[in-house]
């Protein structure tokens, strides 16, 4: 049984709602935005809301209160509660002082340190508190002074890519003043990351032309990856054609490829909607068909996430609509998984292969059922079926869609799949039926009852001679359910 269970865990993608926690108001950001009083917090806590519980993303009350600028006295009260120790690990391995630094909350940072918060912690992405603050755009020199006092090192504290605080904060700078400050604390205009990228490349991500001009005046070199960095932009701010033309005017190479095999259009194609920008780069010889080290092209990225207008525009330049990335995913697969029905329909209209399979043997139907809960599902299904999609083909490891839906514990999906003539008793590579998988993984007997109602055989055994009843008996999620009907 244990062997089978491990196989299942390694082969199936489970929907997080399967293990969904009971709703906790302390995990709702709007609750903290209202700056609730301690009295209100106590009332909510008395009603069963857990003040120290981490949610599925490892955020808790203290983190959300910090992120939403709740009064510091309230946050201090939360910290006094059992389970909210100052060095508690939260999302991405960050303790509370990381989030205080992220919000430029120096008062809270000092309070946490007074309560023995550690300042030498490195998060799951390789960031110290200093570098996390810099990478999120913090420019308060008083906070940096304090972190230096707490033994942070401006010169040598680096992330996994070898970038120090000067490089990490560069994209967010409005002027040269913080650069001067960091230089006075030990940084250098010659500082580079592990790939030889310096402050000019990092500043190019932010697209501040005035700052870039100042750096040029200071004699800073314009690295070969500058246009790549500029094309990436920031999460909430993307660069414009003006920035790209400026960089070209000062000698930055436009048609460049980085160590990951990407050109500037790889990043731009995800969400830039300015046709003039695409025309500019294409006119400079930047290739929309270039596949990076993971096999993805700018066109694939557009099909994954951009508008129909951009996809149509770039499609005029592609050489093979059915090119695949290293995981065997075509532009059509990506559009089914992540884009809208109009892009799916367009790609099919220009020759995208309806029978495409990824490297694991999954067809388009696999990607379609993974968006079952979205409003796009039925529309995409209709388009794909009209173009010849067969829904009862086997997927990876000889799984049917019923196997996958059972592993996801998704009764609604199982019912929707019933019309596609899928053999409910088919066995996958591990010689398991959908019912056997459900018996091991479901949290409700309703799925078991449904599978039996559509013809699933219950008098079958695993390779370890275990019956359906045996499997369900070992399922902790069913320990309070009556499963005698499986005998």
Positions of the model-derived regions?
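Eukaryotic tandem repeat interaction scaffolds
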Residues: 240-271, 275-426
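Ankyrin repeat A-helix N-terminal signature
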Residues: 34-35, 64-71, 99-105, 132-140, ...
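Bacterial Sec-dependent N-terminal signal peptides
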Residues: 1-26, 480-481, 487
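Leucine-rich solenoid repeat scaffolds
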Residues: 452, 457-487
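Ankyrin-repeat boundary/"N-cap" motif
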Residues: 22-32, 53-66, 88-98, 122-134, ...
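N-terminal leader/linker segments that initiate helical-solenoid repeat arrays
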Residues: 18-83, 88-91, 473-474, 487
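Solenoidal tandem-repeat scaffolds enriched in leucines and small polar residues
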Residues: 137-266, 271-274
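Ankyrin repeat domain, specifically the short helix-to-loop turn at the C-terminus of the second helix
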Residues: 45-50, 76-85, 110-118, 145-154, ...
């Amino acid at each position: 049984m244990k062997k089978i269970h491990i196989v299942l865990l390694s082969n199936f993608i489970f929907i997080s709602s399967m293990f969904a926690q009971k709703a906790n108001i302390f995990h709702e950001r709007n609750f903290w935005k209202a700056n609730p009083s301690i009295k209100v917090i106590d009332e909510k806590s008395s009603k069963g809301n857990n003040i120290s519980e981490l949610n599925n993303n490892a955020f808790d009350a203290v983190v959300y209160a910090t992120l939403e600028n709740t009064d510091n006295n309230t946050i201090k009260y939360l910290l006094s509660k059992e389970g909210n120790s100052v060095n508690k690990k939260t999302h991405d391995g960050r303790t509370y002082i990381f989030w205080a630094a992220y919000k430029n909350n120096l008062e809270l940072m000092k309070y946490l340190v007074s309560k023995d918060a550690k300042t030498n912690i490195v998060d799951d992405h390789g960031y110290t508190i200093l570098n996390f603050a810099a990478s999120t755009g913090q420019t308060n020199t008083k906070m940096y002074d304090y972190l230096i006092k707490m033994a942070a090192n401006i010169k040598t504290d680096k992330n996994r890519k070898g970038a120090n605080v000067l490089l990490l904060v560069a994209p967010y700078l409005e002027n040269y003043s913080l650069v001067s400050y960091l230089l006075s604390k030990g940084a250098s205009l010659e500082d580079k990351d592990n790939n030889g990228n310096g402050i000019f490349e990092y500043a190019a991500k932010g697209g501040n032309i005035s700052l870039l001009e100042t750096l040029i005046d200071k004699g800073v070199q314009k690295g070969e990856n500058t246009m790549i960095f500029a094309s990436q932009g920031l999460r909430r701010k993307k660069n414009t054609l003006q920035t790209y033309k400026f960089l070209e005017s000062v000698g930055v190479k436009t048609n460049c490829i980085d160590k990951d095999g990407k050109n500037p259009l790889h990043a731009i194609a995800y969400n830039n909607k300015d046709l003039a920008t695409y025309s500019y780069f294409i006119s400079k010889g930047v290739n929309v068909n270039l596949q990076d080290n993971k096999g993805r092209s700018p066109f694939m990225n557009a099909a994954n996430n951009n508008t129909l207008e951009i996809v149509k525009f770039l499609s005029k330049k592609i050489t093979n609509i059915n090119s695949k990335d290293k995981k065997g995913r075509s532009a059509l697969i990506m559009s089914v998984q992540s884009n809208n029905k109009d892009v799916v329909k367009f790609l099919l209209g220009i020759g995208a292969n309806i029978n495409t399979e990824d490297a694991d043997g999954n067809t388009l139907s696999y990607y379609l059922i993974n968006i079952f809960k979205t409003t796009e599902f039925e529309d995409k299904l209709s388009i794909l079926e009209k173009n010849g999609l067969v829904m009862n083909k086997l997927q990876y490891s000889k799984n049917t869609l019923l196997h996958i839906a059972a592993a996801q514990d998704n009764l609604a999906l199982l019912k929707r799949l019933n019309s596609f003539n899928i053999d409910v008793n088919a066995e996958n590579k591990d010689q398991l039926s959908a019912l056997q998988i459900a018996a091991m993984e479901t949290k409700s007997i309703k799925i078991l009852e449904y599978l039996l109602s559509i013809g699933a055989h219950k008098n079958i055994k695993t390779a370890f001679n275990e019956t359906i009843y045996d499997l369900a008996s070992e399922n902790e999620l069913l320990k309070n359910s009556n499963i005698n009907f499986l005998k």
